[in-house]
Amino acid sequence: MVKTRFAPSPTGYLHIGGARTALFSWAFARKQGGKFVLRIEDTDLERSTQQSVQAILDGMAWLGLDYDEGPYYQMQRLNRYQEVAEQLLTQGLAYQCYASREELDALREQQRLAGLKPRYDGRWRDSRQTPPAGVKPVVRLKTPQHGYVVFDDLVKGKISVANHELDDLVLLRSDGTPTYNFGVVLDDLDMGITHVIRGDDHVNNTPRQINILKALGAAIPQYAHVPMILGADGERLSKRHGAVSVMHYRDQGYLPEALINYLARLGWSHGDEEIFSREQLVEWFDLAAISRSPAKFNPEKLTWLNQHYLKMADDARLVELVMPFLLERNYPLPATENLLKIVNLLKDRASTIEELADASAYFFRTIEPPEELRTQYFTAEIRPVLEYLVDRLAQIEWKRETIHHEIKQTVSSHNLKFPSLAMPLRVMVTGEAQTPAIDAVLELLGKEETLHRLRGRMEIFPG
């Protein structure tokens, strides 16, 4: 059975690159009818935090990336790492190294000055020296000194690395905690991971991890290293490109299905399909379709996708999502029925839930029109026409159809074109020049509030 995993370190939030890796691993497992595992690699005691763990769990939940096992925590498996390290020591496949940090720093400096690649020189590999008193050793793997590590990467193709280019990597630190390479190998082995899907910044780790597996006599999983994500300028993605946490996008009013759709298209494609559901992603997903070239992060494309999903979203769901944004702005919440109508009216004009909240402002408070709009539309000539319309509106049943009829009748009786009246009316009521159809806006605003705003605005007309 296919089994994949996502194994983040809890040293920050779930960022775009990590979320894409999780998505690819999740989609492949679902496509193959396999299992997806979540594992928290928390052995970096100085940087790992419970807050980061929660941020990762929240991000996964929001994206809908459900896992079949986990979350597992490396720090709960320390005995296992120490047990296997002891086994390798007993078999002569690993050794204890007592070299101090100062010694290793001096060695690297000598190698640098000599123009050599910095690497451990194996000074304790076959040493019969008496261990220094009071020094806790690290445990190093006896890396083969001849031959090659060869593996077929499911994205990059065949990769071959000479063993003489690899030094004897540390398996256990002096405090008994595993290094990344040792911990991840044992975790994948014990959890039955068949396919390791991860960023290509881990390619150089793979030969080292394969050598550990060979020392253990274990089966080698299949590897798929996905290309990194770049900013539009070709530089590695960072915060200045908008590469913030997944939850930041939620807080800005993006929908999870939009982010899933966008992340899937970062380095993977299915023909020319730009928009697809989670179910279609699972149906179509193929590791062979992942590009070997880096993907470029385009915030505008993500926003475009989000706009599409907003238009398609259920109004009741959008009401639930927009409410926190309205409360944050101290807007008085109307009845749910009215809020449903407001959302339905405005959602085609918004790119995010946050924009939807901002666009609805004139339904909840009076907005002063900018000077340029007042100068353009509040003229002495149009004032008597508006006064006539206000008198007519005060007498009608408040429905969109009757509102539209009165505006149209007023335009006709005064020999005007529709925009000549609709635009001043729009600016008077909303403070903006661009809104949905003015009759729809007035209906939702309500008769009392509409007349109150129109009569109040008459005072600022010239003449």
From Swiss-Prot:
A GO term from the CC aspect: cytosol
Locus of motif 'HIGH' region: 8-18
Molecular-function GO terms, alphabetical: ATP binding; glutamate-tRNA ligase activity; tRNA binding; zinc ion binding
EC number from the UniProt entry: 6.1.1.17
Subcellular location: Cytoplasm
InterPro entries documented for this protein: aa-tRNA-synth_I_cd-bd (IPR045462), aa-tRNA-synth_I_codon-bd_sub2 (IPR020751), aa-tRNA-synth_I_CS (IPR001412), aa_tRNA-synth_I_cd-bd_sf (IPR008925), Glu-tRNA-ligase_bac/mito (IPR004527), Glu-tRNA-synth_I_codon-bd_sub1 (IPR020752), Glu/Gln-tRNA-synth (IPR000924), Glu/Gln-tRNA-synth_Ib_cat-dom (IPR020058)
Gene3D superfamilies given in the database record: 1.10.10.350, Glutamate-tRNA synthetase, class I, anticodon-binding domain 1, HUPs
Enzyme class: ligase
GO biological process, one term: glutamyl-tRNA aminoacylation
Catalytic reaction equation(s): tRNA(Glu) + L-glutamate + ATP = L-glutamyl-tRNA(Glu) + AMP + diphosphate
SUPFAM superfamilies: An anticodon-binding domain of class I aminoacyl-tRNA synthetases, Nucleotidylyl transferase
Nucleus found in the keyword field: no
Sequence motif: 'KMSKS' region, positions: 236-240
Binding residue positions for ATP: 239
Annotated PANTHER family: GLUTAMATE--TRNA LIGASE (PTHR43311), GLUTAMATE--TRNA LIGASE, MITOCHONDRIAL-RELATED (PTHR43311:SF2)
SUBUNIT field: Monomer.
Family that this chain belongs to: Belongs to the class-I aminoacyl-tRNA synthetase family. Glutamate--tRNA ligase type 1 subfamily.
Protein name: Glutamate--tRNA ligase
Originating organism: Nitrosomonas europaea (strain ATCC 19718 / CIP 103999 / KCTC 2705 / NBRC 14298)
Classification lineage: Bacteria, Pseudomonadati, Pseudomonadota, Betaproteobacteria, Nitrosomonadales
